[in-house]
Amino acid sequence: MTREEAIKKIIFAMDVKEFSDVQYWAELLSQHVGMFKVGKQLYTACGPAAVRMIQKCGGEVFLDLKYHDIPNTVAMATLEAANLGVQLCDLHAMGGYEMMNKTMETLDKNFSGCTARPKVLAITVLTSSNEETLRGIGIELPVPEMVVKLAKLAKSAGVDGVVASPQEVELIREACGKDFLVVTPGVRPSFASADDQKRIMSPAEAVKAGADYLVIGRPIAAAQSPVEAAQKIVDEIVAG
């Protein structure tokens, strides 16, 4: 794998709330990561302006708002995300088949024959969760089995891929095929701590398992030199 290919796999989690920080990180890292993730805190604080600033700095965007509501509401919200020109956006697989399918039909209808729509991802089981977490909400399945079940449901609904722990990537590949996108948080390079993630893997391990994109935040943001940290992660991926 080339360095350019490795860079494209990294999604920097822009976990900030100040608009000035958006421009800072976008300008600093736009040549060193493939995409920027805008989550709930930043989007609530700054709205679409955060997305536009990243785009102005030449960056691509994963709008990570994890929609989960009645089908029409999620479909319309996802359409608005798509109209912002983001590359990735997501919803919860636990919202069910109808919610996911309605969303994909709405996007395909509105983007038919024109600009390519963003890829839509379904959240499976959050990387901060484990089997005890699932039991607490009445789910008795082991985490890997639940992840695969949700991934297969998402694929059947027309969703482009999933967000899942790197530990489940190989299982998802077996169940859903090589063209189904897999985005993995819970990735920690050799120089970083696990923080609040429970199901983690190194960048090289996650890519080897078949991950298309790696979501990485604190190991880069908290480093003395964020650019050097990003470059080290690229080194790890290339070295395999």
UniProtKB/Swiss-Prot annotation:
Pathway it works in: Pyrimidine metabolism; UMP biosynthesis via de novo pathway; UMP from orotate: step 2/2
SMART domains assigned to the protein according to its UniProt record, in alphabetical order: OMPdecase
Listed EC numbers: 4.1.1.23
Keyword terms of this UniProt record: Decarboxylase, Lyase, Pyrimidine biosynthesis
Gene Ontology CC: cytosol
BP GO annotations: 'de novo' pyrimidine nucleobase biosynthetic process; 'de novo' UMP biosynthetic process
Pfam families reported in the protein's UniProt record: OMPdecase (PF00215)
Enzyme class (EC, first level): lyase
Active site (record annotation): K66
Binding site for substrate: 15, 37, 64-73, 127, 188, 197, 217-218
Gene Ontology terms for molecular function: orotidine-5'-phosphate decarboxylase activity
Record's catalysed reaction(s): orotidine 5'-phosphate + H(+) = UMP + CO2
Known function: Catalyzes the decarboxylation of orotidine 5'-monophosphate (OMP) to uridine 5'-monophosphate (UMP).
Record text on subunit structure and interactions: Homodimer.
HAMAP family noted in UniProt: OMPdecase_type1_B (MF_01200_B)
Family (UniProt): Belongs to the OMP decarboxylase family. Type 1 subfamily.
Name of the protein this chain belongs to: Orotidine 5'-phosphate decarboxylase
Species of provenance: Citrifermentans bemidjiense (strain ATCC BAA-1014 / DSM 16622 / JCM 12645 / Bem)
Organism phylogeny: Bacteria, Pseudomonadati, Thermodesulfobacteriota, Desulfuromonadia, Geobacterales
